[in-house]
Amino acid sequence: MSRLFLQVRSSISFIVCATRCFLKDFYESRQSVQSDKVAALLVGLAQDNVKVVLVTTGGGTEAIASLFCGGGASRVMLEVVVPYAKKSLESLLGGEQERSCSPGIARHLAMKAFCRAVALETPPQHAVGVGATASLRSTNPKRGTHRIHVAVQTLFATTTATLELTKGVRLREEEERIAGQLILARLASSCTSGKNKNNFPVMRVDLSSEETVTIHTTTAPLSWQLLVSGEQMIVDARSEAVLGAEKLSEAETRQRLVFPGSFNPLHEGHRQMASLASKIAGQPVEYEISITNVDKPTLDYTDLESRIVRFDAVERVWLTRAEHFTEKVVLFPQSTFVLGADTFMRLWDPCYYDGSTSKMSEAIAFIAQQISGFIVFGREYKGSFCDPQSLSSPSSLLNKCRFVPEAEFRTDISSTVLRKYRDQ
């Protein structure tokens, strides 16, 4: 009986050992194939003169190891950033974020990476920003889904991929591997428009039969590309025409009634302000959205598209790179600007002038000289209604203002609250 037991135990040990060896060889074989594909990907990117900056948070670090474990990475990769802590992510994106793992955050990171690549002296047409954010299995079980969002930003398009993982069937290491695979796959797929597109490998992502990757792409018109590349400061949001081109002259931006804002989203409060301002000024409102902003990340193409579609077809919407008001008044000379009280107050806040009161004074004098006037509306600010008539405005601006009293207009609609409900 004991001899039989020993024989059975020996057989089981052999089977276990053989299985381990098989799995080890199988895994190493797949790793070798993946390494070969990564090497081929780097070669293809290098041949197209592509330069990449990667930013990932919450997972996906295996993609970094895959890209740098062999030769050729230095010809393609400019920088990798891993803002893992909440404060680190907020510092990178310019403030507290409503959610840390979402398609929007992935796009913000990708645009940040794209801008960084351009700042490192990469021609915009060759710059690629990859942003990834993941919520994966951790020591403490998560109430939400396990998911990965990967965005790729180029001069030509914004692409976002979302993968929701089947919860509770994989180890953290396995989910990390899939996150890394998805990053590599999206990098390869988003860079296949060059002359060497046939040389790019198809990167594998180990999904179950129930899992699918959802992809959304926003392709930019030429005017948007010129704006993002910095070749233009202002474009018509719905037109291919740009300033200096045959269809659009600088006269079209002079003596306008301009309503600047982020409009994320455009809501009834904005509509009421525009309607009343139009009656006061006797001309139609034209909206302005700056893709760059002192307080917020640069807007990507998907962001722009989602905001612009909310405007009526007959309404004119301008896209600019004017993050400072001193730039807006140059783009729209002798125009009247529609502002909320909170935005109006920023015009004389030294924080927006590197803390310099002298720079602030110079800017205020310049703005007052360039504009036709302001129409200023009251807004809820820090929990209470701010009546613009109660503000201690600089005299040079005060003389140019038409304040709309609370009796004529008040709405407490919050864009922040609307975004919160929209993103739930």
Regions found by a protein language model. Give the residues of each.
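N-terminal chloroplast transit peptides
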Residues: 2-8
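Generic short N-terminal amphipathic or hydrophobic helices
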Residues: 11-14
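Nucleotidyltransferase catalytic core that binds NTPs
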Residues: 26-45, 66-69, 82-87, 91-94, ...
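Helix-adjacent hinge/juxtasegments
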Residues: 93-119
